[in-house]
Curated annotation (Swiss-Prot):
NCBIfam families: trpS. Its EC number is 6.1.1.2. It catalyses: tRNA(Trp) + L-tryptophan + ATP = L-tryptophyl-tRNA(Trp) + AMP + diphosphate + H(+). This is Tryptophan--tRNA ligase, mitochondrial. It comes from the Eukaryota.
Length: 360
């Protein structure tokens, strides 16, 4: 039954426009070129503006445009840093509610909890035994994170890109929507797929990256850094459940410069350009049109315009999250059903890998 389901799944996958593989942009694939899409998000609780514009919004579009997509709440990745079990359990449900409220539809895509599909860790160990230590130590994110922690990072933090590769390859994914900061990790995924195929015969597709159209959303208080939930400055990050008053306050305090005109010049006017990019994204307008409409407006007034646009965008999402969070049983059922569907796809792939490696 699982094999029949997988054959059926293989026949019904397709994907998107802004493809990127390695340093060169790839051509836009035709629908029949796309076999499977996978992406994941850590259970950080309620997403912020950067999560929404950088990933979730494009996920909704992708599931609507294509027949078969998997989205995972990657809780195994989250424990590479210390977690309170009670908070983690709630954060998983909060992220589930947020994804559903934003438009992720379990009938159009498979939404599941990573830790409930044991094949992820099984494949991860096999791939871990194929990658050299220096390769992981030279990844940018490992260097950056261990520098912050004074080289006290865990083995899990070092090897999480291999688990990320297993997440993707386990479903024989052909395309993966990623942000700019994940391109190097996707190169590792591609290399591991090729290494496995070279050793055991052609088995895994070599997945391609899809860069999201929205670049990193910057911190409202420091436009040189990306927006982050862990930012100690609470005015730097807009959560999608913030009240209208909180959103207005955060945009009022957003860092700009001493020039009052609204322009889009990311290299020289990072703060104002970040506001323009956010405004364009939530309003569904080109940056040029946003700048044109803002002619004659000073940045103080413009901050309120952007705040109003964000409030309008998030109002229905916020309301839906509040309703969904009141129904814990429903959220748990969504994850349970999604995890069962994911396992139905993962199990036969993992069994074939075990045969190729010599375990069966």
């Amino acid at each position: 039954m699982a094999l029949r389901s997988m054959r059926k799944a293989r026949e019904c996958w397709n994907f998107i426009r802004a493809l990127h593989q390695g340093p060169d942009a790839a051509p836009v694939p035709q629908k029949d070129a796309v076999k499977r899409i996978f992406s994941g998000i850590q259970p950080t609780g309620i997403p912020h503006l950067g999560n929404y514009l950088g990933a979730i919004e494009s996920w909704v579009r992708l599931q609507d445009e294509h027949d078969s997509v998997l989205y995972s709440i990657v809780d195994l990745h989250s424990i590479t840093v210390p977690q309170d079990p009670t908070i983690l359990r709630q954060s998983i449900l909060d992220m589930t509610a947020a994804l559903l409220a934003c438009g992720i539809n379990p009938e159009k895509s498979i939404l599941f909890q990573q830790s409930q599909v044991s094949e992820h860790t099984q494949l991860s160990w096999i791939l871990t035994c194929m990658v050299r230590l220096p390769r992981l130590q030279h990844l940018h994110q490992w260097k950056a994170k261990t520098a912050k922690e004074k080289h006290n990072g865990t083995v899990g933090l070092l090897t999480y890109p291999v688990l990320q590769a297993a997440d993707i390859l386990l479903y024989k994914s052909t395309h993966v929507p990623v942000g700019e900061d994940q391109v190097q990790h996707m190169e590792l995924v591609q290399d591991l797929a090729q290494s496995f195929n070279k050793k055991y015969g052609e088995f895994f597709p070599v997945p391609k990256s899809i860069l999201t159209s929205m670049k990193k959303v910057k911190s409202l208080r420091d436009p040189s850094a990306k927006m982050s939930k862990s930012d100690p400055d609470k005015l730097a990050t807009v959560r999608i459940t913030d009240s209208p008053e909180e959103i207005v306050q955060k945009f009022r305090k957003a860092m700009t410069d001493f020039t009052s005109e609204v322009t889009y010049e990311p290299a020289s006017r990072g703060g104002v350009s970040n506001l323009v990019a956010i405004h364009a994204a939530v309003a569904g307008l080109p940056v040029e049109e946003v700048v044109r409409r803002s002619a004659g407006m000073d940045t103080a007034r413009y901050k309120l315009v952007v705040a109003d646009a964000v409030i309008e965008k998030f109002a229905p999402i916020k309301s839906e999250i509040e309703k969904l969070k009141m129904n814990k049983d429903h959220l748990e059922k969504v994850l349970q059903v999604g995890s069962a569907r994911a396992k139905e796809l993962a199990y036969p792939v993992c069994q074939e890998v075990k045969k190729l490696v010599g375990f069966l």
